[in-house]
């Protein structure tokens, strides 16, 4: 960055903002880069400002019981704030004084007042000087207030971030990530520009008092008629505002419904294409869009009337002020024009400035109070450690994730006794409440010596992660003692990668030791991966490690933990995403050898790890099931496998929770409308019955992270339906929560509410920060694996990959959740995250405007209609002028003359008409014509938005994956959220305002030019200068705005990155380092924003200077060339003053239109995306064995079997090469093999070898070359839809969209209920669906959050059964499944797909039992294609990965003679499907 010219600028340069000229010149000539931006002054640095505010806030906390953040802000910024406020007031006062001089100038033209004529020139000079003074006062004042607002935002940004790093885990579990981002975007952005309006709260009353005093002098009591009208108008506008809010509230819910489906569609676009659901999704979204647009139109009409009221009110204000006085006393011409000028100022003050100021204070104080509440939340308490301690000891430790259960229970009991329910069954309310306080860990005792390895095992939800959290101090024990040295290193279950190089991620701020670093790299099997990168370990990783595979991320996280020299290493399931061979090597070389002298606690479920551990701790439901050595375990607990793996009583355990959850659900549906709660009760945070099905449940929209939620919490109650939460006066639909994209931080979205098309759980869910930290960003390999060159993160948002226990054991916060969300409005939709795909020109091209206008032919006619009406208005004014100009003047003797006023001219009847006709024609107040001009325009522009949304949706759904792979999913989603919101809301009204203002200015100039032709000569250069200055400024300002957007992205990215890795940060003590990084991101953004504000003020000041010059010219031309016509001078000067304010407003509107049209450019860019090859490249009548084959995919149950293709499922793959993008590197090369009909093939290979990619290539989701045939039919011979319908798919990332069970299973509605129930029976879903209200019509939301991951897999299985596909593709179906669901899937595969070809991609050896052939993929090519027996020869790498116990499972008969009977480990053998009885999930 360059040094800022501001540092050496003179006072004059600072006053006129001349120091910005170098950047404006450079931006006009070339494209600006980040290096061109100036450094910020030290007074604006985040370090200085945060320290200043933090010091005052600490002082406030120390001195008062009820600390107020506003007091701390006052002590920091008050005096500067008031200084600029006084400047602003003085500038506004000049506007009130100008009409006085105008009146004197007009009076000087009175033929009977000759002595005044001589001083007219001096009065003109005085009037021009007032304009100059106003310019010199207002612009520095406004800039100063913007600057203070920026500093306040920076200081509070930093304070919030620092507080976030200190929050306790309990508090983090009650705050959504969306709310925190909302803090830093919507709430704090109010300070940036809103502060300039704040002073009008006191300026406007003073100004109104001054103006009314001056008008009283002219018109006496009549003055209050105009003021009364303005007050009525302001109240009318307030009423319209309330009506508009009502429509916006209703519309917000509809927008959310559309966005939830749209985002699910984008996040799972590969699944949509694999299932051939493009048409179904498009129809679904368009139906929601229709309903939304009806409300959009209503809101737009109300906003139109609100905006029009200001324009059309000018005439009435003057008319009502002047008419009573004129009727009673008669009126002089001077008073009319002076009143007009006063009323222009009065109208702006009362109807615009004062309401805006009140709204600013309301918003700002609300934001400050929310931030204040946040800053007082409970902080993470650092435990006291003894550094001399060598062992790790826990004595009688019990812990809860929640506090104060006794008090909560009493509140609930009291509240429930006051509540009258319709069914009278109060006992249901407490059915599980007594179990709410079940501890997550109970009576834990163990001791491990230095250098020992403790393996912690247990089923999902047993409390394994919670145990590690307690050792780290994240979970405070309610009883017992914990003792260790405090020097901890931690590896999370879900690998966390910060933006930076691989080396920086591993070293993580610890001093660099080359020898140690190399040994860690080698032990974690990273040498081979690093060698593939050109920059080796200096390659820069994106946020979340987007360019790495899940296994690579896991190994880097482990390497970071191992590199740190600590006494105690906590490893939470670090091998979850590694293939068997890699896992085995790392466990041996890293955990057992490299760390041999260190104390290690390893969470694992692998038998091999338990055998090598010094001690084993098995947890079950939060209690110790076993503690000891492996040999003791075999002797004392022969049934331990069931507790370890979750087999024993799993189904009963789940069923118990399932029954209670469904009982509560049904009960809440019956109570939902019967138990209203008073406002008083909600404010007291009383218990209430809501429709919230686990408020803290994951929201796939809010938390776009490839995640699996395995946070170990055991609660006896499935979901606390009766939790305490803060109520809000706002409707649910108005809640907004913004969240960045999981791994790149580029999307910001409104809070998604639920679809209300059937029986559903009306919920407002939020993704807690604690959830965010316990979720994975590397859930195995996505079907579309990332390459380093690619910029798209394929899986934007996951579905809830949750185990059944986790779903049913999720707790609801007992403490009030922090509510800092906002309603959806234009500001909320501002992009928090920059789209780096955006390559839109700095200024919107004329081609974009032309294309936008021609989208809908009606728009052209409407614009012509607007022009015709405008010409009619101007023509009417000119005709009146001509007519009155030719009317002979009235005889002076007929007029009444007041001797009391030395220079008063009494207007006759004719001349009074003259004045009012001119004013009517010029001020654009032909109400009927104005009304008919604007409303059709707004209506048509919304229709254009509807058409563009439809075209963009169709284009995205039909785009090939090779194109979509080059885009960020968050960027696509921003087009449907932010840009469509701009097209719907902002653009129509902004275009209307601009056209309205432009026509007013042109009309006024036309009338002035007719009255005084010399003025037209002065107008031409002013217009030319305005156009040139606007073009000059826009070129730079749009680039600065773009750079500001880019600078904003790292702030939010860093926040989310910090939250994801917060436990790691704390364990490593890296909070100060991350605070420094955050301040650097803030300073970068500040540099861009400050320069944008400065250049904007430069432009505004230059525009005003041009207008001042124009007004000076008009004034002196009028004074020097006008003879005796005081009316003419009055009209010219009044209009010139009006043009001054209106033209500047029009200039700003034109800049806004240009900025908003960039959204249109982005939408057109998506509309122009290429489409998939829909038609076959060969004949659509393929031949098989020389005979014509009738190609038919089963789409309903009534087709004849003879017409069906495929019939057998034979596949032949020849020279298949696959790429993600057109010019990308091949992911698979020259793959050739064949599969016999009905054969089962397993895909084997290391993480990232291309297994999932091969399945995608089968579906033609990638850029492919070569040929694939199914039953002799080539993929070139059929359409894409026909080809993909030949496959049934169970993807790695399960896709459940928001809609009914029926829609999710059969989106095209091809099957009857009987057929759907039959399939549900086959896959074990019937008992689940039947217990929900509405059964098949029950609406699933949030990616099916009420279903476990197993249920979702079964849903995918049911879809495949319904599709009657002959080839089934399974991508790691057993990942994260509980054993029971896994057995059901195995059984269904045997029964429903007995005669189908099955291709299975799996890491687990036991999952491969049914496969006859195995395809080994290595280095993008087929290494081997054979049976497992041949793969397990001595030369095979895979033999090393298969343990003897696995071989027993794979070949039980072959090995039975060699294996002695070992009854004590009989439980280790996999349960056969016969042992798993008819399991009801």
Swiss-Prot record:
Binding residues for ATP 1: 401, 434, 458-465, 493
Ranges for region Interaction with GORASP2: 1387-1481
Broad enzyme group: isomerase
Residues carrying covalently attached carbohydrate according to the record: 894, 900
Catalytic activity: ATP + H2O + closed Cl(-) channel = ADP + phosphate + open Cl(-) channel; chloride(in) = chloride(out); hydrogencarbonate(in) = hydrogencarbonate(out); ATP + H2O = ADP + phosphate + H(+)
Regions of this protein lying in the Extracellular compartment: 99-122, 217-222, 320-339, 880-918, 1012-1013, 1117-1130
Keyword Ubl conjugation in record: yes
A single Gene Ontology CC term: membrane
Membrane topology reported for the UniProt record: Multi-pass membrane protein
Occurrences of domain ABC transporter (ranges): 423-646, 1211-1444
Keyword Acyltransferase assigned: no
Covalent cross-link Glycyl lysine isopeptide (Lys-Gly) (interchain with G-Cter in ubiquitin), where: 688
Modified residues (Phosphoserine): 549, 660, 670, 686, 700, 712, 737, 753, 768, 790, 795, 813, 1445, 1457
Function per UniProt: Epithelial ion channel that plays an important role in the regulation of epithelial ion and water transport and fluid homeostasis. Mediates the transport of chloride ions across the cell membrane. Possesses an intrinsic ATPase activity and utilizes ATP to gate its channel; the passive flow of anions through the channel is gated by cycles of ATP binding and hydrolysis by the ATP-binding domains. The ion channel is also permeable to HCO(3)(-); selectivity depends on the extracellular chloride concentration.
Protein name: Cystic fibrosis transmembrane conductance regulator
Gene source species: Colobus guereza
